[in-house]
Amino acid sequence: MKNYSNSIGLDISKKYFDAVLFVSGEHERFPNEKKGFTSFIRWLKRHGYGPANVLICFENTGYYSLQLSFFLSEKEFDYVQEHACR
């Protein structure tokens, strides 16, 4: 079992996704497209987080979260998608 130093919460919509660092409460908004995904990873790295020490959590929003899921997997980030009805 991994021991993560922080968790990131995402709120994903059609055009944007919002990210919050749980430890500091810092917030940032990114476009929900590949350019935004890349900016999100740079933002994480500026805060000292990478695939080895952060867990990303978000609600499964179907198509809106699908491309981000693929991107995070490709970059070897751990993430949890929660079903909206739970």
Label the model's feature ranges.
Residues 1-86:
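Phosphate- and other anionic-substrate recognition elements at nucleic-acid/protein interfaces
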